Swiss-Prot record:
The lineage of its organism: Bacteria, Pseudomonadati, Pseudomonadota, Gammaproteobacteria, Pasteurellales. InterPro entries: DUF986. GO terms for cellular component: plasma membrane. Keywords: Cell inner membrane, Cell membrane, Membrane, Transmembrane, Transmembrane helix. It is found in: Cell inner membrane. It comes from the Bacteria. The chain crosses the membrane at residues 1-21, 45-65, 66-86. This is UPF0266 membrane protein PM0830. It is a multi-pass membrane protein. Belongs to the UPF0266 family.
Amino acid sequence: MMIINVLLCLGIFCFLLYAFYDQFFMDCWKGKTLLKVHLKKQGQKDALIFSLLIGIIIYQTYTNLSSATLYLLTALILLSVYAAFIRAPMLLLKEKGFFFGNIYFQYADIHQVNLAENNILVIDMKNGKRLLVHLLTDQDREQVIQFFGGYK
């Protein structure tokens, strides 16, 4: 059981580092944030299934688990609920690039930007990758389009 507790602690610690990076560090990193746009939340069903599976594990092995393991599994459920239902993904537009999916892309690496149906911004990169940015509202779409230079 000790190895399970160590792995759970390590996973929770890594998630807390990620949450700190996501909420505080990305705003300050790589220059000033010129535009911050909230995106559609995805993966809520996955997090719900994950939480239910952990709940089933707790229910099935309640008598065999130590109290520390129970607390760590409960913390894992709370973190997955935070990640899926409370935290909002963001598109951070900076001076020389942008953060999408917590990864920094430079504007010089963009080949083409298109707008698809349902407020989906399609960013084609020069390396052949395609980023699908699911914008939340029409107002967000207009702000991003104006940031990239308007309709052409």
